[in-house]
């Protein structure tokens, strides 16, 4: 298996630092079969240094804190420099800053991972594609005998889309307030949105 070969960028800069796109893409990654892999720093939305040669731009030190060398090392100098320019400056974007912020990328990462872990269908269920009438809308269902099926629904476009119409009431696992969509009413899909739905 190969990881991070060929792409010289981190995820957040590729997504123009857009949290909606980040959430939709990570929800998609975590709902597909297989073992999820996060590249270090992506759990806090770290940026990259495109001026470094080869793939070194996305291998900069992990940004643990606003301390010297981003809290990564007490050495006088690290092999690769820390990112010190906005919007990915280590002094403002680091684990310590995000640790207690319920709206941070780190909190969203933890929420996605915990929600996935709590659903047997997302961990090891079979995948069945669901047809939609819109090329920008991706839908599939994950099923297992060990728990309820999860309908995964994504709008991968920059404009709202009409969603599918559920046959039963469904709860959105990705809506922190536990939003319920009633049977027979279309689920509206905001731009770059993700939904994990259970009956």
What are these regions (language model features)?
Residues 1-150, 156-161:
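Loop/helix patches that line or flank the sugar-binding groove of alpha-linked glycan CAZymes
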Residues 65, 130, 165-168, 190:
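A structural detector for beta-sheet-dominated domains
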Residues 144-145, 177, 199:
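Short, flexible beta-strand-to-coil junctions
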Residues 154, 181:
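A conserved amphipathic helix/loop scaffold
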Residues 160-177:
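Beta-strand-rich binding/interaction modules
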Residues 183-199:
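C-terminal beta-strand-rich structural cap/linker in extracellular carbohydrate-active enzymes
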């Amino acid at each position: 298996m190969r990881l991070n070969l060929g792409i010289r960028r981190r995820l957040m800069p590729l997504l123009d630092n857009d949290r909606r796109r980040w959430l939709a893409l990570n929800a998609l990654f975590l709902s597909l079969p297989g073992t999820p892999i996060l590249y270090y720093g992506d759990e806090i939305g770290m940026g990259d240094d495109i001026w470094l040669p080869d793939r070194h731009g996305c291998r900069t030190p992990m940004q643990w804190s606003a301390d010297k060398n981003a809290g990564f090392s007490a050495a006088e100098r690290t092999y690769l420099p820390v990112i010190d320019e906005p919007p990915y400056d280590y002094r403002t974007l680091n684990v310590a800053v995000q640790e207690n912020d319920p709206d941070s990328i780190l909190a969203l990462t933890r929420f996605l991972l915990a929600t996935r872990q709590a659903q047997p269908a997302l961990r090891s269920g079979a995948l069945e594609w669901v047809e939609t009438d819109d090329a920008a809308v991706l839908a599939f269902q994950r099923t297992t005998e060990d728990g309820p099926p999860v309908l995964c629904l994504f709008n991968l476009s920059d404009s709202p889309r009409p969603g599918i119409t559920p046959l039963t009431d469904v709860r959105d696992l990705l809506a922190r307030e536990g939003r319920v969509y009633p049977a027979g009413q279309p689920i509206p899909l905001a731009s770059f949105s993700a939904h994990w739905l259970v009956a």
